[in-house]
Amino acid sequence: MAGHSYWTNTPLEALRSIRMQLKDTLDKYNVQFWQTETCIMGNDEEIGGGGGYDRTMKTALYVARIIHHDIVYAGARSWQWWRAIGGDYKDGLLREYTDPDLHDGKVEDSKLLWILGNYSRFIRPGAVRMSIKATDKSGQVIPEGDTDPQGLMCSAYQNTNGQWVMVVIHYADQEKNFTFKVDGSKVKSWQGYRTSDEA
């Protein structure tokens, strides 16, 4: 089944509950789900709605949170954005500036482009999402600890070549330390990639 994530992102409680209801229904009928289109709309008030191009992390993190919830809670097997190039709106990964005669111009990238790349570049077709559990310092499991929609959100995947990928979204302004381990598997090395307003 294909669907769109428009108008399902606010309030935060609905972001998760709508996707969990969808997943329950999909599982009942043994149907897979592809999220085939979304962009920033007027109801996305947390980031000022869809008007005005934003190349910063504000929009990028907002969309990363939607991707995380679509994959983790709705079980989306594929995820697509609305369009690649746009004008003065939050709907393009790239912002185009053209002269009136359309003979010259420039293109500017956004952090949204790079956030999407953290998924599409590293999580390859055929990858399997792995379970994650968060624990406190004493080792006690924190229910839903892998998803704090205003803090850390984590998901992990194993590609068909055996490579592991972990996507960590840090929504809060404060620094947050965490450690991770992979049970039952020997990992020789990890390579980190960071997307931020500075990098």
Each model region followed by its residue ranges:
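Aromatic/acidic polysaccharide-binding cleft in carbohydrate-active enzymes
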Residues: 32-123, 130-137
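Glycoside hydrolase catalytic-domain groove-lining segments
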Residues: 2-46
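Carbohydrate-binding surface patches
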Residues: 138-186
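Alpha-helical scaffolding within the catalytic cores
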Residues: 15-24, 61-69, 147-152
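Extended hydrophobic-aromatic, low-complexity segments
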Residues: 13, 44, 90-92, 167, ...
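Acidic, Ser/Thr/Pro-rich beta/coil linker or hinge segments at domain junctions
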Residues: 182-199
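Active-site-proximal beta-strand/loop segments in catalytic clefts of secreted hydrolases
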Residues: 3-7, 36-40, 81-85, 169-171, ...
